[in-house]
Amino acid sequence: MLPTLSPPQMCSLQQAICKGAATDAEKVTAIYNYIAGHYTYDAKLADEITSGKVSKYIPDTSATLNSSKGICYDLSSLFAAMCRSQSIPCSLTKGYAGRSYHAWNKVNVDGAWYQIDLTYAVTERVLNANSLYDCVSPLH
C-alpha cells in the first residue's frame, strides 16, 4: 500500500510547505527541509523493533505527521507521501545500511532519480537547500 496523507492534513500542510516553490526541485527541497527541521528520530521505537518487542512494523503516515517523530521507515514513508501529493515520483526503498535494516527514498527530479536519506537529515539536522543534492548522485 502506498503511503498517503488524509486530504485535510495533506492540503493544509502542502500549501504551507511548498508555498512559493515553482519547480519540482524546489518542492522536494522544501519537503526535505521541513521534515529535517521538524521531526526527530524515535530511538525508543527503533530499540523496541531491534529487540523484538515490536514486530511486523508498518509506518502510519498520519501518526508520524502528528507525533513529529519516527524511525527511518516512518520518515521515508512521510517523505514519499508528501512528494506524491505534489505529483513528484518518489519511492520508498528498504535494505541494509551496514548491518542495520534501513529505509530511504528515491525521488525523481527533472528526469533524474536521486537517493535521499531523511534519517540522516533528521539525526544530523542537515538543513541546507543548496547542498540537498550535493550528498547524493543521480541513479543511472
Question: How would you name each of these model-derived features?
Answer:
Residues T4-N66, S137:
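Secondary-structure boundary elements
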Residues D74-H140:
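Hydrophobic/aromatic-rich core segments of domains that either
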Residues G20, G37, G52, G70, ...:
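Residue-identity detector for glycine
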